Amino acid sequence: MGILLKYLRLSQEDLEKPGQAESNSITSQRALIDHYLAGSAELSGMEAREFCDDGCTGTNFDRPQFQEMMRLVKSRGAACIIVKDLSRLGRNYIEVGDYLEHIFPFLGVRVIAVNDGYDSARFQGDTGGMDVAFRNLINDFYSRDLSEKVKSAMRVQMRQGRL
């Protein structure tokens, strides 16, 4: 039996207070995942490790803790990855889809996204369906939209001499 990997992530833009040791969202993600695991007889007894990228974008996968987690996954030491929702895994539609449909199944790793109601064990030999693809697409668009809004606000502040 492999190790259960908890993956937590929060973007820099979403951090609550500068200098805070850990964001409230990371604490909430951990509590949600731990509550889910406590209610699962199948998963609650597994050895677990946590990987946390606090303040890292989800638009790419060059995140220190994600890469560390993937080293363990590739060494065949992981049985399951659990996240709060698929947007915590990433916000790049193509890459998240590649991980869910190709990489994790090839490596024999189960993926659970608690709030999305997604468990890859229910989709063996199949993808998660249109709802999973649509969620990932929305996550990607959300990130792009937020980026444009931030750039726009910064341009306004620059024109006003506040930045």
Give residue ranges: language-model regions.
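Short, structured surface patches at the beginning of a domain
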Residues: 1-157
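N-terminal cationic and glycine-rich segments that engage phosphates or anionic surfaces
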Residues: 161
